[in-house]
């Protein structure tokens, strides 16, 4: 059923169209195939929800689903299932008159939990059970809604129904029975029966939950299997995502995702598409962790984890589910008048229909179950933080005990974290998750101790202290995992900065800086000749530099070999040339170019961004001993490779960014000084761009920034793992190793530290720009016509997260906008242009830069986020094929990887040929010109052979 929100915020376009005895009024919700209106029953004036489906938009399968929904709703009569009042069909529409749920859906309820007190029907609930500042709903409210959802699911299960689309958007809410009994303001909602507003379970003073939208439901006995892909991806069971046959246990997964979202405020897994979502689920290895700031009792966490098992046979069974203490037991923590009115009688009777058993409900209300032993708010808090005082022998026997080393939330040795599909910018996503082993290593680095929960008041309980310590570790690990999710990128920034600060402040590295360096030279490490450090110094703040137009000190001369770009950074001239190559195609596509100073012309070009790396590289001019590369040096190479690729992707994103947000007038001028543009014109960000162009540019810039962030994150994770290993081994200072090995370790430590500082600065900068682009995208989407697919009103409900503070909140991207596709197309275009220029012998150095940049882009496309230390890239396409035969990598299937590898190999070949040609030209130009014979003239007489004296 279409998601419905309170009319104050979503009502529009009054209709006032008559359908039978009902009148269609304003729109209150919109789904994929139907629009929901507020309607009025004319004889009684009662409110109904009218789901209007345009038959012309439905194919045969969707029509069949609609008729199935109608038949199912006609046969279901349960207080926690939305009732069907009437159904009318015309030549063009089918109108379903259903119960009106004025509080909207559970998704809206969770999202707006901080504003619920503004609704008069919810004021008392918030007063008694305030919502947590961080996380989801109050534990009492979570248990209340979960009981009512379980009652509806049990009713369906007894009739062999599988819903197949359980999600917060399909869980609708009405005011509590107590509030409706005493409130007489305004028209009432039409009731299917008197029992339809009397809850089977839960608390009378809290809102009542009703399950809706049976468009995908079907009768499926426990022995049958279905194989139709349906439902909402974020809440789909893994077996459905794998296109496997499934049974009723698929609903158990969806219930677990809803419970997790009620507890934490977010789904357990988020991704841009179902392929990436499935990979995240599978790589999570059934380790469901909860954020550190969410406080819930053990039994609630237990049942959530038992729902969220990737294999259906590992999940909790339906009998176990319906008999679980969370479902059958009392709700702890009730206050005030809720204590004696708690309704806890389960609805497990196969014939628990309200219409068939009204007397049972009356007996339940007349003889409430005695209140539990522990009913005070203080006892609830004690249970929340680990003191599980037994309420009754039955409940205590069913309470799981979590002990260190045996927690379902602890990472296992086989964990492989999900990585963001660099191909697709997430609707709600994503920075990449890295390997769990890195998470375990990297979590403690630089994290302030004060961030962990403290339970000093119970330090005298050794057993509880041990449990709490285990919980803290699990929660810290979850923080790191969440930080690598794109929607929680701010936490990742905290981790990146903390780790960089720790390395910068390390006395061991400070001591290592005073040890003389072993003369060595890698063929790929060439710094600027006039720079003692071999690279450019880091400015105090690149953000200030860009805002004020400050120039950086000029450093001349590009490195000797552009081919070394993959291992180290570039000089300013190299970076400018790369930027020039990157923006070349944009001139043709968008008609927008940069001023000369932005493409490297002039003695002191103003840098768009800090070229990589801005830290000391090994001194040039020394020759090494050509020994095999050691492990430390390999780590250095991998970190610098990943950082360099991120720099290329960042440069591509900057092309889009500068078209969206032009430079200030102080920076936007050429060698002749400020141009004659008016300041107002220069600051008009949307000058010359249509709204659709702004949306497209914003989406492209955002996905490229996300890709750059993923590569930066990988560099930091590799450095974090290396740092932890060195801290354990204590070999950075090299005091107990041979001289050359000691010097190598020292140099590796210095270079990794420099790389970490560069990554930290770049990460913060990219994060800030990604947020600016996100805001611009959201604003531009609102300016689109209402009938445009990109307008917020036409976004799918499951992907629509508006008003959040994270980098991707409120972002819905157009289909097909992926980082890989953009990078692949740009690499092809750059290489083709370079090939044309090469054949014409024009701008050969520029051709070399274009080839190199294209190679780095394609390498970034193929980057495997699942390998901290990747295997060496094979020059053979056949060997690369064997390496990626295992399936998809970062959402790219083998066929696509094969195509990219072929293009990559061709460009490498062209680069190799170009370098040979340039070397031949250089040798030819360095040769002295041949000396021409000089002729002597004496008195005008020309010497002849006859005049030559004989020998």
Curated annotation (Swiss-Prot):
Binding-site residues for ATP, renumbered to this chain: 28-36, 51
Membrane-protein topology: Peripheral membrane protein
Record Pfam families: ATG1-like_MIT1, ATG1-like_MIT2, Pkinase
Active-site residues, as the UniProt record annotates them: 165 (proton acceptor)
UniProt entry keywords in alphabetical sequence: ATP-binding, Autophagy, Cytoplasm, Kinase, Membrane, Nucleotide-binding, Protein transport, Serine/threonine-protein kinase, Transferase, Transport
Principal location class: cytoplasm
Molecular function as annotated in GO: ATP binding; protein serine kinase activity; protein serine/threonine kinase activity
Annotated EC: 2.7.11.1
Subunit annotation: Homodimer. Forms a ternary complex with ATG13 and ATG17.
Family named by the database record: Belongs to the protein kinase superfamily. Ser/Thr protein kinase family. APG1/unc-51/ULK1 subfamily.
Name this polypeptide is given: Serine/threonine-protein kinase ATG1
